[in-house]
Every structure is written in C-alpha cells, then in structure tokens.
C-alpha cells in the first residue's frame, strides 16, 4: 500500500483529486497538538483540585471500612506522582468532548453534508455514553468490586493495607476502562461508515460476541454473585445489539442512496 493511500479514508469516494500526503500529515500533527494542549490544560485544572479528587476517589473505601480510607504512601514522591496520575485520568474525562471533536474534525473531509450536520449531536451522545459508563462503574460496580477483594483478603487471614499507588492505579483504569467500553456503539458507527465491518458480519457473530461479553464480565467482576454478573453483562449485550441495529440502518440508508 502506497503512503498516499494511508489517509484515503479522509477523502470522499466521488472526489477526483487527492490531497497531498504531507498535507494529511500536517492535519494529523495539528490534531495531535490540539488534543495534547487540551489534555494538559484539563490536567492542570484537575491537579489544582487534587484534594477534592482524592476524597471522591476514596469514598468507596470509607463506605466499606473507615480504616481503609487511610492509604499507605510507601514512596517519598507518591503525593506528586499519584496526583499527576489522578489528574491525567480525570483530565481525560472532563476533556473527552473536545478530544472527540478534534478526532471528528480530522476525519471531517470524508463526511457527507448530512453527517456533518449530526456531528455535534453525535459527540454529545458519545460523551453521554462515556460519562454513563464512568458513573455506573463508580457508584455501583467499583464499590462491589472493592468489597469483594476486601472480604477475599480477610478470608485468607490477611489485613488489607492497600497502598496509594496500587489503589489509584486500579480505580482510575477500572473506571475509565468501563467508560470507554460504553463507547462501543460509536466505534461501530465509525467502522461501519468506513466499510471495515458490516451488518451481516455483526449479526453472524452475535452468539460469539455475547459469550465473549460474559467472559469479560466474569474477569472484570470477580464476584460469585450471579446477579452482579448479569447486571454487568446486560448493558454490554444491549449496547452490542444497538450496534447491530445501527449497522443495519446505515446499510439500508446507503442502499437507498444508491
């Protein structure tokens, strides 16, 4: 594949002229620069409120055991390192709409007039899905997961004494990962739009996808509670089904257009 074909997805099929490869690279560079600046500004804001962030992130611990709320800082620089770590992930959350906009702006040349009109509503829906995933994880799944590990540790005769580094690394990645999982419909929408997957493929692989979802839910939610496992898997199954309908709708619209 020639270098000029790498950015072929940014051009409309009916376009007769191709944009030079270096211009595509320049657009990509500016997209990365804008995303980096946005994330850095968001990190600075979050770092300024690190005390509030710490109290929010440790709230699930206090609900289980007041003593667990006192985490151990084993490193001299833990206060700064963990604060930057927390500010980075919190910065992703608050800057997510702008990051999505810059990504959409990069692929904008390949969008039709109708798709450009629904760009901002689509970004709003995407952020709403992401935020829903984060909140569901924080208020429901995260406390249950921490409680499970707390009791499992005690069942072995050990006293839970978690460190700052371990706790925040687990909580931030777990919460952010769940939020990104809720972006599945948006990812599918983009893949279908550029012809990388089809409605037929998704419908054909539905049984395998559902089994995979339950396996992932079992790994993510290490609890013997069947109801928790079902409650964890059900939203993902619904999201996958919605992706199939999205792919079907897009195929039908494309066939009508032709």
What are these regions (language model features)?
Residues 1-258:
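Membrane topogenic/interface segments and analogous intrinsically disordered interaction regions
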